[in-house]
Amino acid sequence: MRWPLWRVAVAERSMEPALHPGDWLLVRRTIVPGRPPRLRAGQVVVARHPGRPGMLIVKRAARLDAGGWWLASDNPAAGAVDSRAFGAVPASLIEGRVLLRYWPLRRG
């Protein structure tokens, strides 16, 4: 059994100013066998990179297309790869929805 809640560390600057490298996120799994993920446009998600399945990415779910979710970086100037490079991401690759950033407690 996989836990419904898990944690992920942000590794890149692609989601600044909302999230920064070193931030820790609490994530709720969206994959329930037999059910599509319950997501809305604007939510931050953790997904498997379509071209590198062992790599997790943190992106904003921009819209749902016929091929899956269009995932976008908040900071495209950081050079991060998102759906502009790899297209829509199938729902099966969306691992979870970010509930909150729990570390650091405050930014100074």
Model feature map: region roles:
Residues 1-108:
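Extended hydrophobic leader/signal-anchor segments used for secretion and membrane insertion
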